[in-house]
């Protein structure tokens, strides 16, 4: 429905927003149901997620592993801190490239927006250097490719 927008705030925050032509319930479920996550959260074309563990409950763990089929890959692990069904998810994650990145604290909101959903994801990183390094990876392109795929299954 709309492309991902990205803005920074202060030294440690990144705020992503995107609108979806689907209900908050559907978009939330796509972020918490491992069978759905494994279908859309793939990044650029050619990547797959052979491992998708997602225990969407407070204290629950998740682990996503991606591969590009050419020997490259990475994984993310994390823990859910808070879940408000269909409206809000708070979690902490770290990426392994192969060494772990510092923890990234993420709050994602799913707000009704007319006939669709406005998703707002606020990341809080430990310092400006970590934020700059994260943004320099081009993650925005991979996120948007995933969200385009998500729209196709909502």
Mark where each language-model region is.
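Hydrophobic ligand-binding cavity/cleft-lining segments
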Residues: 1-46
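Hydrophobic pocket/interface hotspot
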Residues: 27-28, 37, 62-64, 80, ...
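A short, structured loop/turn motif at beta-sheet edges
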Residues: 24-25, 55-57, 81-88, 109-118
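Intrinsic-disorder/low-complexity, polar/charged segments enriched in Ser/Thr/Lys/Arg/Asp/Glu/Gln
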Residues: 11-17, 49, 61, 75, ...
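Glycine-rich portal/gate segments that line the openings of hydrophobic small-molecule binding cavities
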Residues: 48-92
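A generic structural micro-feature
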Residues: 8-10, 54-56, 70-74, 99-102, ...
